[in-house]
Design a protein with these regions (language model features):
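Intrinsically disordered, low-complexity, charged terminal extensions of DNA damage-control enzymes
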Residues: 1-122
Length: 122
């Protein structure tokens, strides 16, 4: 029988060589790992960018990525945006951090997200 499908939109907020990562909640999928900010719809993602990024460009859809979990298939829809920075509300603390693609920090990142981060950026 067909496996359940789920989808999410993730934001690749790029500032120079850095991408903004968000720590996931301790429970649930990829609990406690660093990932891209994730949203149930493109509209939610766009709204978050307007509220939390400084000098954000238009959102550019990138090629989706499929990932299979044991119980369902996950479609990840990346939206990339160039920005000058993030709103003061998103402090560099235990929830958000800039991840340098040129010198990756040793943080736990889910494999599909690592795959996205390794794609060449325009």
């Amino acid at each position: 029988k067909a496996r359940p499908q789920r989808e999410a939109w993730v934001v690749l907020a790029c500032r120079g060589n850095k991408v903004l990562l968000e720590r996931r909640p301790p429970s649930g999928i990829w609990g406690g790992l660093w990932s891209l900010p994730e949203f149930p719809t493109r509209q939610h993602a766009a709204q978050w960018c307007r509220e939390h990024l400084v000098g954000g460009s238009e959102l550019q859809p990138e090629e989706p990525l499929k990932h299979a979990f044991s119980h369902f298939d996950y479609d990840i829809n990346p939206l990339s945006v160039r920005c000058a920075g993030k709103a003061p509300a998103l402090r560099d603390d235990d929830r958000y951090r800039w991840y340098d693609l040129a010198a990756p920090a040793a943080v736990g990142v889910p494999k599909p997200i690592a795959t996205l981060l390794q794609r060449p950026r325009r």
